[in-house]
């Protein structure tokens, strides 16, 4: 067994799932740990799978995403969890979503971005951008605490993507997004019935001036019941 005594932070995770009796958690170590060979990192997540009696649908989804070639799909495994000396159930340990070479391999220091579609949730320490053409609301996951210049740069880059899509010119779209990654992610989301993937908790990243779709999310209540 592995024993780690460096836990520095733990909090309830999720939106609708945070209301379940069996809650999921995000937790952080004070130093990096390589859990189950997934790579060294401080931040990790425990999915409760509270609305899935089988407990396996999120695991199947993440494994399918990897088989379909969706980049940076989180590694995960099942674990039994004790909290304050009490057994609280079987959970799915996953990598948290963050820009790291062993997770989402993008270079934040040199202008890459990690964004999240979030239509309504408001967090005081997060910057948000509403796109010019379609009014889509993005949370800027990384970098944190962006400057007005960075905010404008992100706004303009997303604006170019939307302008290309609106033009109906496929070659223009190919110039600003990785169309294969978007198509693969769309097919995956349709197959898994991810009814919220277009408006909440769906992440994208800009890397080397190109926008790519990426899984990096959990399946929500609706998908677990599908």
What are these regions (language model features)?
Residues 1-226:
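Phosphate/dinucleotide-binding and metal-coordinating scaffold of catalytic cores
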């Amino acid at each position: 067994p592995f024993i780690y005594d460096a836990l520095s932070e733990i909090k309830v995770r999720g939106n609708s799932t945070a209301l379940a009796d069996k809650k999921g958690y995000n937790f952080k170590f004070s130093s990096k740990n390589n859990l189950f060979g997934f790579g060294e990192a401080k931040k990790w997540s425990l999915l409760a799978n509270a609305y899935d009696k089988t407990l396996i649908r999120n695991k199947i989804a993440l494994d399918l995403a990897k088989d379909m070639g969706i980049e940076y799909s989180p590694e995960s495994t099942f674990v039994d969890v004790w909290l304050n000396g009490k057994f609280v159930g079987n959970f799915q340990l996953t990598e948290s979503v963050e820009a790291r070479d062993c997770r989402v391999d993008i270079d934040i220091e040199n202008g890459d971005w990690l964004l999240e579609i979030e239509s309504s949730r408001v967090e005081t320490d997060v910057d948000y951008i509403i796109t010019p053409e379609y009014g889509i609301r993005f949370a800027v996951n990384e970098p944190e605490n962006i400057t007005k210049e960075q905010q404008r740069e992100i706004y303009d880059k997303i604006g170019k993507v939307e302008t290309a899509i609106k033009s109906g010119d496929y070659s223009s779209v190919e110039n600003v997004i990785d169309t294969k990654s978007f198509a693969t992610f769309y097919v995956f989301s349709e197959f898994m019935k991810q009814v919220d993937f277009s408006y909440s908790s769906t992440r994208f990243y800009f890397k080397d001036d190109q926008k790519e779709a990426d899984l990096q999310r959990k399946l929500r209540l609706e998908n677990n019941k599908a």
